Amino acid sequence: MLLTMNLQLFAHKKGGGSTSNGRDSESKRLGAKSADGQTVTGGSILYRQRGTKIYPGVNVGIGGDDTLFAKVDGVVRFERKGRDKKQVSVYPVAN
């Protein structure tokens, strides 16, 4: 009669978990800050991003960290730019 043994090895030191775990970066709050159709003032941040995920359109500037901002007061419009790109524009509203 042949006996088979099931031998399982487990960690014998578990105390290092609190040291090796427990690191997470703070969220960067990226993304849209103004919605399509929303009225904004000049200088308002429209979209925070890393790289040019969305391109600047009419009356929209781009900051050093690729943040898109309104250059004039107006209404925000998210539009397609070509086949696979997006852009955001701000169109002034006639009083």
Swiss-Prot record:
Molecular function GO terms recorded: structural constituent of ribosome
One GO term (biological process): translation
Keywords: Ribonucleoprotein, Ribosomal protein
Post-translational modification: The N-terminus is cleaved by ribosomal processing cysteine protease Prp.
The keyword Ribonucleoprotein is annotated on this UniProt entry: yes
UniProt-listed Pfam families: Ribosomal_L27 (PF01016)
Propeptide, chain numbering: 1-10
Any one Gene Ontology cellular component term annotated for this protein: cytosolic large ribosomal subunit
Annotated region (Disordered), positions in chain: 12-38
UniProt similarity note: Belongs to the bacterial ribosomal protein bL27 family.
Cross-referenced PANTHER family: LARGE RIBOSOMAL SUBUNIT PROTEIN BL27M, RIBOSOMAL PROTEIN L27
Full protein name: Large ribosomal subunit protein bL27
Organism: Enterococcus faecalis (strain ATCC 700802 / V583)
Gene: rpmA
